[in-house]
Amino acid sequence: MAAKKSFIIKQKLAKAKNQNRPLPQWFRLKTNNTIRYNAKRRHWRRTKLVC
């Protein structure tokens, strides 16, 4: 990744960084909740971004 990034690329990287986290524990405790983990987790070395 270049040191000089365009603002659009920087925004996409920031969004991907925020999305790459586990589910909050309080969300798992909600009634009738079937979601157990974040299926869209991304590892920085295994799966690269398309942006």
Swiss-Prot record:
Coiled coil: none annotated. Keywords: Ribonucleoprotein, Ribosomal protein. One of its GO terms (molecular function) is structural constituent of ribosome. It holds the Pfam family Ribosomal_L39. InterPro entries: Ribosomal_eL39 (IPR000077), Ribosomal_eL39_CS (IPR020083), Ribosomal_eL39_dom_sf (IPR023626). It comes from the Eukaryota. One of its GO terms (biological process) is translation. GO terms for cellular component: cytosolic large ribosomal subunit. Interacts with YIH1. PANTHER family: LARGE RIBOSOMAL SUBUNIT PROTEIN EL39, RIBOSOMAL PROTEIN L39E. Belongs to the eukaryotic ribosomal protein eL39 family. This is Large ribosomal subunit protein eL39.
